[in-house]
Structures are given as structure tokens and as C-alpha cells.
């Protein structure tokens, strides 16, 4: 049976912050805790699943691996909480980076990884999150984000060398191969050399600013274009905007996770938009035309037929969201809610009482009411 997505288990978007994850986890853990549900096997299993999901998503390295490989990132270790994954992966000590790095180091070129023998270590991929309004998701928007990253060292022009030269020596750890082997029980595991980062050579005269790495930590401000029609949880890839690669290697990518704030008027379902509109009782009974707001900022007029009931829907074609990578558009649905008047004046009460007397003397006008009481009569007649 396929495992449930960890983000779905916790009820959060893929761009959820650490605080949002913790809040969601605490709420669900309290709800499904075995002490609160004694003898409930389903609640106990749910509690275990919630803990498993939070154990992965609260850890940046595990979360990055899960975002990339899904549940497959943990299958060989028997699960995210298994012993082989604890404390830097137990028996797999010496693997720098996260779970994703382990997969790349073990299977490297076969998986199409960027790291290979005798090449500099490519820059790490980065994650960022942005939150936008529903109206911004409709129109598309540009937003700026600040990202802590590593950039090319200005002092050595990214070469890692104090004299900006290409002078280097054969790496003493891997002998120039760029990869080293380690015995792990019955297996011999090959991984990227931790000394030279896979380049096979080390800088002869390291830069004092970056210690030969070719990169330094810095915060960057980037402009992100969010397309019209983007959905909650969408991941946008900015190629080459991740960390700079060591000593001239290719940079990583930046993945921006988009979350959308709830709107006070509109709700969204795919490309369609829904708006709940209150109607006075007389409006619903008599019919007429009403003016409603549309998500594009305009106003639309909708004809309401006489006898409209709560729950009736009216469609405005093409007034919904645009569909990504398509010319199609969704629709807007007006959902009616008929309101019962409160705090009546004396005159209003008199009119309603007169209306009720008239309604009681007529055989038509309330088909659902009449149908219900006809069924009640049949029920008692059959006793």
C-alpha cells in the first residue's frame, strides 16, 4: 500500500515553515495520542505516522531528501527513524551533506548526479518559501526573497587560490581519483573525496578569505516571478541560483515553495473560484439581479430566478483562474445562502404573519415543504 505523503499527514503545504510544522504536529499528536484514545488501534497507527512524518520534515537534511526522492529516500534504512539513519547515518559515517548527497555519492553518475570523479563539487541546492494572497495567485506577481547562501569569493575570484592561479597539487587523500572507498560491513562503498570535493587536486596556496573553498557565505536578495494560476504548494525552480560551486564548479538551484493565504471572500478549487453570496429572503423568493465581486477585481451581475434556494449555484464562465501552461480558464461559481431576517420591526412581522397565513392556504409554492410532510403522512399511515 502506498504511504501517505508526509505533508498531507501533517496537513501543511510543502512550503511550510519550521514553526508551522511544529504547530501542526503538536495539534495532531495531542488529538491522536494513545492516552486520549485507549484501545483505538487506528488512532495509535495515526499517532505513529504523524511522528514519523514530523521526524523527517523537522530535519532540514531529511526534508531535502524527502522532497527529492519521496519515501524511497528512507526505504533501505527501514524508515526515517531506523538505526541506520541516526547520528549521521550510523554505519555510513563520513558522508558529508544530507541523505540526498548519500544517494548521489553511492550511485553518482548512474543517477545522473552532477558530482563525478575529478570534478569540483557543484553548489548545493537551496530552499525558500514565499506566501502570497489568492488575488496575487490569480494575476501572477513578483516578490523579493532574501536567501542565505554561498557566493563566489571576491578575494580570489572564486579560484580558491591566494594568487588567483590554477596552481594545485594532487590530493593526498584520494591520490587524484576524486573518490575514495570505504569498507562498510560486507560492502565496499565509494564516495566523493572529502578533502578535495571530487576534484582530485587541492589548492597549493589557499585564499585566506575562503580557506581555498572559492566561496564565502552571504545573503542574497532575489526577485521571483510567480506565474498567474499558481497553486498552493507549487515549487518553482530557479536554475543556477543556489549556492556557488567550489572553485568554479557549477552552482546549485534554488527551489521556491509557494503557499497561498486564505481569502475572506473567495475559495479556490483547481482553476475554479467559489463565492458564497447572502440573499435576503424576499430577493430569493421574488428573483432579480444582484452584483457580485469577481476575483479579477471587477464586478459581475447575476440574474437570480424567483424561488432560489440556499445551496443553488450560478456559473460565470471564464471568470476563474488561468490554467498553467494552457490558454484555458476556470469558472466562477456563485453559491447562494438565503438569510432568515432577524430583529423584525412591527410592520415586518405583520407582513410575514400575513404571508404565512396566505402560504398556509395555498397548495403550491413550497414543493420541498409539501413533499416532506407528504412523506411524514405516509410514514404514520403505514404504522
Curated annotation (Swiss-Prot):
Question: So what does this one do?
Answer: Participates actively in the response to hyperosmotic and heat shock by preventing the aggregation of stress-denatured proteins and by disaggregating proteins, also in an autonomous, DnaK-independent fashion. Unfolded proteins bind initially to DnaJ; upon interaction with the DnaJ-bound protein, DnaK hydrolyzes its bound ATP, resulting in the formation of a stable complex. GrpE releases ADP from DnaK; ATP binding to DnaK triggers the release of the substrate protein, thus completing the reaction cycle.
Places the protein is found: Cytoplasm
Record's subunit section:
Homodimer.
Which note does the record give on the cofactor? Binds 2 Zn(2+) ions per monomer.
Binding-site positions, Zn(2+) 2: 171, 174, 193, 196
Q: Which gene encodes it?
A: dnaJ
User: Which GO cellular component term is one of those annotated?
Assistant: cytoplasm
Q: Which cofactor does it need?
A: Zn(2+)
GO biological process annotations for this chain's record?
chaperone cofactor-dependent protein refolding; DNA replication; protein refolding; response to heat
Any one Gene Ontology MF annotation carried by this entry is:
heat shock protein binding
* ZnF CR-type span: 140-219
- Provide the residue intervals of the CXXCXGXG motif repeats: 153-160, 171-178, 193-200, 207-214
The record's comment on protein family reads: Belongs to the DnaJ family.
Gene3D superfamilies in the record, alphabetically? 6.20.20.10, DnaJ domain (1.10.287.110), Urease metallochaperone UreE, N-terminal domain (2.60.260.20)
Q: What keywords are annotated for this sequence in UniProt?
A: Chaperone, Cytoplasm, DNA replication, Metal-binding, Repeat, Stress response, Zinc, Zinc-finger
Specify which residues bind Zn(2+) 1 according to the UniProt entry for this protein: 153, 156, 207, 210
User: Domain comment text?
Assistant: The J domain is necessary and sufficient to stimulate DnaK ATPase activity. Zinc center 1 plays an important role in the autonomous, DnaK-independent chaperone activity of DnaJ. Zinc center 2 is essential for interaction with DnaK and for DnaJ activity.
Q: Under which name does UniProt file this protein?
A: Chaperone protein DnaJ
Q: Which residues form the J domain?
A: 5-70
Read off the SUPFAM superfamilies from this record. Chaperone J-domain, DnaJ/Hsp40 cysteine-rich domain, HSP40/DnaJ peptide-binding domain
